[in-house]
Amino acid sequence: FITKAIPIVLAALSAVNGAKILEAGPHAETIPNKYIVVMKKDVSDEAFSTHTTWLSQNLNRRLMRRSGSSKAMAGMQNKYSLGGIFRAYSGEFDDAMIKDISNHDDVDYIEPDFVVRTSTNGTNLTRQENVPSWGLARVGSKQAGGTTYYYDSSAGKGVTAYVIDTGIDIEHEDFGGRAKWGKNFVDQRDEDCNGHGTHVAGTVGGTKYGLAKSVSLVAVKVLDCDGSGSNSGVIRGMEWAMREASGGGNGTAKAAGKSVMNMSLGGPRSQASNDAARAISEAGIFMAVAAGNENMDAQHSSPASEPSVCTVAASTEDDGKAEFSNYGAVVDVYAPGKDITSLKPGGSTDTLSGTSMASPHVCGLGAYLIGLGKQGGPGLCDTIKQMANEAIQRPGEGTTGKLIY
């Protein structure tokens, strides 16, 4: 998160004999006439295909009947299928069409699409002296104030990290050729024109600035030059990354277990976003997610509120809770997130603050541990919590004081 996550409560509006239509809270930046439609868990691929055929036919009939003054809706624009347990589609629909969709037996719930933003406000052991970011030294030390990062030479080798963000400057020399472009779901610019994603990726796996110095990095661009994008676009990026991490869509558990994902972004609480994240976790992929920067309970943000992901709050250099960091029972661990120095597009560096900077410390640590032979997947978050120190002073009501180590 860059500055604030939007507090939201999803309230179900009644749809007569139909699916729930979830209403965004008053501060959500909803996108007019854009919706995410989620199918019931027992809907098969065949039934899903039949449903989308019905949808197209219904839309065509409405198009033929519409008046010349009414705006034509684009209809279905994206389809999602994550792990066989989350099937959905998104698109542009008018109120009458949404009512028809909500009354279809296959539909579980519908929620408005909205804007999502970045979350910025930062063995054979090798010694890295005088580290360029205090976060590296803190992860490698039991006490605050260190300047050295100790790491095993494996350093995440053989592991792939998917950075779902604003893109990555894959030519930055600190990546040493280990970063590559994956997929762009937001614009026509296959570059990081914002800088957030490059900074995050640098903490995950930069040669000088990262925790997992040998990890492979993949850019999944879902946020634009302003650091924003749609929730439906983010879910498309999540779906693509899951397929790639699972062996190019072949669903191999071995490939999934050697992959990690980082999501230093978020928005209002979204059942669709949480369900997509849970599908990724159930596919055996470790996910680190920023808790958000509104100094409120992270249960109101997504995907931070999804229990199966590893939700990360931000700490300061003196082991305090960063003043902006979200908190609450959904937070799994704290990680350095205030004044974190990492990479900037064009070959330079930048210092940023936010739970966006904390989450990649956990993602990088996850990749590092998998490289050492630890079991991947969502259970890796429990391993990280067991290794963590109870170090955070005044972590927030009902919040763990554990800081990664």
From Swiss-Prot:
EC number(s) given by UniProt: 3.4.21.-
InterPro entries xref list: PCSK9_ProteinaseK-like, Peptidase_S8/S53_dom, Peptidase_S8/S53_dom_sf, Peptidase_S8_Asp-AS, Peptidase_S8_His-AS, Peptidase_S8_Ser-AS, Peptidase_S8_subtilisin-like, Peptidase_S8_subtilisin-rel
Chain positions carrying an annotated carbohydrate: N121, N124, N250, N262
Signal peptide: 1-18
UniProt keyword list: Allergen, Glycoprotein, Hydrolase, Protease, Secreted, Serine protease, Signal, Virulence, Zymogen
Principal location class: secreted
GO biological process: proteolysis
Subcellular location: Secreted
Residue ranges of every copy of the Inhibitor I9 domain listed in the record: 34-118
Enzyme active site: D165, H196, S356
Protein name per UniProt: Subtilisin-like protease 6
Organism whose genome encodes this protein: Trichophyton schoenleinii
